């Protein structure tokens, strides 16, 4: 288990693979880092890359402060830069899904030399009005403490394993809501 302290917050990450360039894997909001292994991504990618699998603030073993200032994209980029410094990676390939892709978009804009290439899934760099409204509704749902109702959206798509759901349900709903801001 690897931890880096970034902006006074503990950020959990794991490493895999021992050859090739660095690739950072950043999952979507609330999806545990174990999803990368369960989905077969780590097994496939570690053949050609040294992987950094980040567990974003508010999730899993990373800290979950109840202060919105810690969950900005700028703060999340700082966490990644601190992890890259810790593993001595000058640059990385970046695979981001959802929230991870949004972080990747902004990081590639602000620190273009740190990202060799960006693979984004489930996100685009421009937030639409309807998307903002949807995110506000999801924040309210999380703040109500009813994580089971919030997770229902993934049940219909068969995106969560029982173990992943259990990990999410053990988390802090307020930190999850802040993570959507």
Each model region followed by its residue ranges:
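Conserved HGGG/HGGXW glycine-rich cap/lid loop of the alpha/beta-hydrolase fold
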Residues: 8-63
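The conserved SAM/SAH-binding core of class I Rossmann-like methyltransferase domains
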Residues: 52-54, 97, 121
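Active-site loop/oxyanion-hole signature of alpha/beta-hydrolase fold enzymes
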Residues: 43, 52-93
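Short acidic-hydrophobic surface loop/beta-edge motif
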Residues: 2-6
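Flexible "cap/lid" loop of the alpha/beta hydrolase fold
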Residues: 102-110, 115-145
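Conserved alpha/beta-hydrolase catalytic His-Asp/Glu region
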Residues: 129-132, 144-181
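Structural signature of beta-strand start/N-cap positions in the alpha/beta core
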Residues: 22, 50, 90-93, 114-117
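Conserved alpha/beta-hydrolase "nucleophile elbow" surrounding the catalytic nucleophile
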Residues: 92, 96-101
